[in-house]
């Protein structure tokens, strides 16, 4: 009876956590690749059986944890996104580890379901009988003695496929071993790349003193630029129109990438489209340029707390920042952006020297509930309002309703309420307090949001690996100032580049505003064109496969189709 129960639980573990294998087989079709696919599955099933019947208790426990955890992560990912988790997705999840509480709240039902399927595996591997007691298995007892070492075979097999196919080829492979193969390939690749290259110092010529008193960059979170009132009739109220003639709207812009960490990293180091992977390691940071230009550097992080860093920021980079500000954990999510607005207003009012301020706003990362007050519901119906705690990463959000159409309507309405509050309230506080006669403020966002309006399954809003829909890369791009000389240049820039700008153009524009020689900027291939130059027709592209290796090519996506890609 125990033997039968053990086999049933193992089958539940393997088959239940590997959804879509049949569809994957159909996709591969009758070709040599199907033989490789089947061979890996045979290896995986055999090694799972060996570890389940291994006589040594410590060996079973040692392998239970990685096998179950890898299964849980990959299966949860598939339940949430309706896609297999690949190597690039795995790396993105590691980069987004700080947002894990968001997932535990919003997708709690799917996580519980995945956990129950994986629990079957944990029980099956560790319950009796074992090889030394299961009479029919004494003939293979020699193999179970080496069960721990033999677990490496499917890991190496999947890793070899990943390595030879540029990080691809793991779709439909056993989730029990995929994650371990991802770790191996990532580690081997890092070892082969060797130590990181040294960063270059700032070599760009500067004209002298800082020409503008305060330069502020606001990198909002998860904002679709085409849903805002500045770009859409009857769009979401942002409060930006109150800036009147000081508002220079470049329309919808393309982000650097469709994921927060990639966009923020690329932005802070001023990468170009052609060499971004090298430049994130070798370029001087925006802080270095600002300090050389005579600016005091300030970073306001509205998302993390207690010194936790995000978006690939390192302790070395932090040392370039004169004032590093994170918010008190007692602030509720919907209180954070208004608090930042008041903090910024005070900074601008009391500054006694030139300052460069970079802000990562709280914004509207999912889940959207808890990021606006209960009395600020304009778009209805919404997801159920609930208290999410005081952390930057909210938890315990009510799960979606069963009906997909109703869920999607509520999902999007909650998002619209969130951006209405977090952008609108921010600028309602900041604009009256700003002296735009000596300040330039740039407002954009790290990526857009995909609401699957075309009926595609899943609730993945951004960070798609591979070809991505345009909505993931559509962000706003606005500049606020009333400095006459700058306003004249911006007016000309908007006339030339409305709905043509990219975030890649913002960094060199900031350097020009800081007083770096524009002729040097124009003549250097180390920078994209500024917003003051006429931008090329195919300028609005964003990355959805950012970190590439093993011969794989990055994936670029347009937010507007203007001919062949």
Language model segments and positions:
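Transmembrane and membrane-interface helices of multi-pass
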Residues: 1-174
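Active-site-proximal alpha/beta segments of enzymes that process anionic O-linked groups
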Residues: 154-396, 474, 502-535, 540, ...
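A long, amphipathic alpha-helix that forms part
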Residues: 178, 199-203, 384-441
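Metal-dependent active-site segment of extracytoplasmic phospho-/sulfohydrolases and closely related
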Residues: 216-217, 418-462, 510-514
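Histidine-centered active-site microenvironments of extracellular/periplasmic hydrolases
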Residues: 231-236, 437-487
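A short beta-strand-to-alpha-helix junction
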Residues: 277-284, 401, 409-420, 464-473, ...
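C-terminal, low-complexity/hydrophilic appendages and adjacent surface loops
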Residues: 546-565
């Amino acid at each position: 009876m125990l033997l039968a129960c053990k086999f049933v639980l193992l089958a539940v573990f393997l088959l239940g956590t590997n959804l879509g294998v049949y569809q994957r087989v159909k996709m591969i079709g009758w070709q040599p690749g199907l033989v490789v696919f089947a061979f890996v599955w045979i290896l995986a099933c055999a090694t799972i059986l060996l570890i389940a019947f291994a006589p040594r208790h410590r060996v079973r426990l040692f392998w239970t944890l990685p096998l179950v955890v890898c299964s849980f992560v990959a299966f949860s990912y598939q339940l949430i996104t309706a896609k297999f988790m690949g190597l690039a997705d795995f790396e993105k999840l590691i980069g987004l580890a700080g947002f894990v509480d968001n997932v535990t709240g919003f997708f709690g039902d799917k996580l519980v379901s995945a956990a129950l399927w994986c629990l079957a595996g944990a029980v099956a591997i560790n319950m009796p009988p074992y090889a030394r007691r299961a009479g029919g298995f004494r003939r293979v007892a020699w193999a179970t003695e080496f069960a721990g070492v033999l677990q490496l075979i499917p890991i190496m097999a999947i890793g070899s496929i990943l390595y030879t196919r540029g990080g691809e080829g793991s779709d439909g492979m056993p989730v029990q071993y995929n994650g371990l193969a991802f770790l191996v390939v990532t580690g081997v690749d890092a070892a082969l790349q060797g130590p990181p290259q040294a960063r270059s110092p700032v070599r760009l010529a500067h004209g002298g003193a800082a020409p503008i008193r305060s330069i502020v960059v606001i990198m909002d979170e998860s904002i679709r630029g085409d849903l805002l009132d500045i770009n859409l009739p009857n769009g979401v109220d942002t409060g930006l129109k109150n800036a009147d003639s000081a508002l220079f709207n470049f329309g919808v812009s393309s982000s650097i990438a469709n994921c927060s960490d990639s966009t923020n990293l690329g932005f802070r180091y001023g990468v170009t489209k052609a060499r971004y992977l090298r430049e994130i390691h070798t370029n001087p940071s925006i802080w270095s340029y600002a300090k050389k230009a005579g600016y005091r550097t300030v970073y306001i992080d509205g998302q993390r707390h207690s010194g936790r860093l995000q978006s690939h920021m390192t302790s070395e980079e932090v040392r370039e920042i004169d004032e590093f500000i994170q918010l008190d954990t007692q602030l509720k999510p919907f209180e954070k952006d208004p608090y930042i607005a008041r903090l910024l207003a005070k900074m601008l009012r009391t500054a006694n020297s030139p300052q460069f301020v970079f802000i990562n706003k709280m914004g509207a990362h999912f889940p959207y509930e808890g990021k606006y007050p209960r009395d600020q519901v304009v778009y209805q119906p919404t997801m159920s309002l609930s208290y999410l705690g005081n952390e930057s990463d909210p938890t315990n959000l009510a799960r979606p309703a069963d009906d997909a159409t109703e869920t999607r309507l509520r999902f999007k309405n909650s998002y619209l309420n969130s951006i209405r509050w977090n952008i609108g309230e921010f600028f309602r506080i900041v604009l009256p307090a700003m002296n735009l006669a000596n300040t330039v403020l740039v407002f954009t966002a790290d990526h857009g949001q995909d609401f699957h309006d075309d009926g595609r399954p899943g609730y993945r809003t951004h960070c798609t690996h591979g070809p991505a829909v345009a909505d993931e890369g559509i962000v706003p791009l606005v500049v606020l100032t009333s400095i006459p000389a700058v306003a004249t240049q911006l007016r000309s820039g908007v006339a030339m580049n409305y709905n043509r700008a990219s975030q890649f153009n913002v960094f060199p524009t900031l350097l020009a505003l800081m007083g770096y020689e524009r002729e040097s900027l124009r003549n250097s291939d180390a920078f994209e064109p500024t917003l003051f130059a006429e931008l090329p027709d195919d300028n609005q592209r964003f990355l959805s496969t950012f970190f590439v290796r093993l011969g794989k090519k990055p994936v670029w996506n347009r937010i507007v189709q203007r001919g062949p890609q």
